[in-house]
Amino acid sequence: MQDRLFQSEEFGTSAKATDTLIFVCPYSVPIQKARLAIRRLVRAGYHVVAYETTSAVFTDADPMILPELISRIRQDIRSRIAELASEGAAEFGFFGSSLGSFILYNCVGREIPELRWGVFNTGGNIARGVWNMPALRQLHAARGWSLPRLEEAWAELQQPDFGRLDGCRFVFASSRRDSIAPLRDISQYLEPMLQAGAEVSVYEVPAISHRTAVIAGLWKGPQLVRMARRPNLV
């Protein structure tokens, strides 16, 4: 599917006989560049519905684009799940990286209750993440935005109302050397999920930056998904 804010593509065999993974690419990474990671998940036995997002979500320096993007992807995921369920698919999980992780953070729980397990490949405060990227900080500052104003604009996205997450299992992959979404800040991101009843584990990946943390998480994708889907088999 094509939309002005995102594109999507499906990979793998019939979803009826396999678990389905909702896969959201990192910021500014098209599906084409994530194909290796996607193929490894398909070989591990998953049907994959992949999404890529427009870089304009941040390069346009308009904070209203992000909530619109999340809303549209949520709507599309709901439609995909309903269609796949009608074809016999029963299990739905996710794998999101960087911005994709934040988008899926706003999809679990009451928004899309079918997503009961999955992987957040890096995660944290989205406003600080944007502000920690010099090019994006410059673009937003030129439009009159400051870090406090961005945090205010995205406050509802940063603290979504999950409802209850009892029985949900999530894995967060992170690195203490990630300067964009550092491991030391992840507790603020996890605590609301823990309070809502989810089982959450943290996996530290070897990395020297946000980019390499994301790449390491993608490479370990099948292992991280197993940790979330069937923790006793890892």
Question: What is each residue range found by the language model?
Answer:
Residues 1-16:
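N-terminal cap/lid segment of alpha/beta-hydrolase-fold proteins
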Residues 14-54:
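Short, surface-exposed "cap/lid" segments of acyl-processing enzymes
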Residues 64-86:
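Alpha/beta-hydrolase active-site loop
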Residues 95-104:
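Gly/Ala-rich beta-loop-alpha elbow adjacent to hydrolase catalytic centers
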Residues 106-148:
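Hydrolase active-site cap/lid region
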Residues 130-135, 140-186:
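The feature captures the conserved acid-bearing segment of alpha/beta-hydrolase catalytic domains
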Residues 179-200:
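Active-site-adjacent alpha-helix of alpha/beta-hydrolase-fold enzymes
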Residues 196-234:
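C-terminal catalytic histidine-bearing segment of alpha/beta-hydrolase fold enzymes
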